């Protein structure tokens, strides 16, 4: 048995596209890519707008959290002071 060769056979292509056809194909492809790019830019603009709104809301939430943390610290501090003053009053003989 004889092995077939691995070397590709040469095929001559007689129907290669003309330069004007290639140019038309490339222009159509560029137009498609440009429309996709414009669509993506529009989506990006919408996402940036939403992100700006969300960033402001997150800033306000951060300020609210900080104020709650400071208020709870003050309440805990006042409760500790009150508890220690009550303990001192009980220890003092009259």
UniProtKB/Swiss-Prot annotation:
Domain of life (superkingdom): Eukaryota
Keyword Cell membrane: no
Compartments (UniProt record): Nucleus; Cytoplasm, Cytoskeleton, Spindle; Chromosome, Centromere, Kinetochore; Cytoplasm, Cytoskeleton
GO annotation, cellular component aspect: cytosol; DASH complex; nucleus; spindle
Disulphide bond pairs: none
Repressor in keyword set: no
Keywords: Cell cycle, Cell division, Centromere, Chromosome, Cytoplasm, Cytoskeleton, Kinetochore, Mitosis, Nucleus
Record region (Disordered): 1-25
InterPro entries listed in its UniProt record: Hsk3 (IPR042332), Hsk3-like (IPR013183)
Ranges of compositional bias, category Low complexity: 1-20
A Gene Ontology biological process term: attachment of spindle microtubules to kinetochore
Quaternary structure and interacting proteins, as annotated: Component of the DASH complex consisting of ask1, dad1, dad2, dad3, dad4, dam1, duo1, dad5, spc19 and spc34, with a stoichiometry of one copy of each subunit per complex. Multiple DASH complexes oligomerize to form a ring that encircles spindle microtubules and organizes the rod-like NDC80 complexes of the outer kinetochore. DASH complex oligomerization strengthens microtubule attachments. On cytoplasmic microtubules, DASH complexes appear to form patches instead of rings.
Function (record text): Component of the DASH complex that connects microtubules with kinetochores and couples microtubule depolymerisation to chromosome movement; it is involved in retrieving kinetochores to the spindle poles before their re-orientation on the spindle in early mitosis and allows microtubule depolymerization to pull chromosomes apart and resist detachment during anaphase.
PANTHER family found in the cross-reference section: DASH COMPLEX SUBUNIT HSK3
Entry similarity comment: Belongs to the DASH complex HSK3 family.
The protein, known as: DASH complex subunit DAD5
The organism of origin for this protein: Schizosaccharomyces pombe (strain 972 / ATCC 24843) (Fission yeast)
Encoding gene (name): dad5
């Amino acid at each position: 048995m004889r092995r077939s060769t691995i070397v590709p056979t040469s095929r001559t292509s007689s129907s290669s596209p003309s330069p004007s056809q290639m140019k038309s194909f490339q222009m159509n492809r560029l137009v498609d890519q440009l429309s996709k790019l414009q669509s993506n830019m529009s989506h990006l603009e919408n996402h940036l707008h939403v992100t700006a709104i969300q960033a402001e809301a997150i800033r306000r939430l951060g300020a609210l959290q900080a104020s709650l943390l400071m208020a709870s610290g003050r309440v805990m501090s006042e409760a500790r002071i009150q508890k220690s003053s009550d303990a001192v009053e009980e220890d003092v003989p009259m």
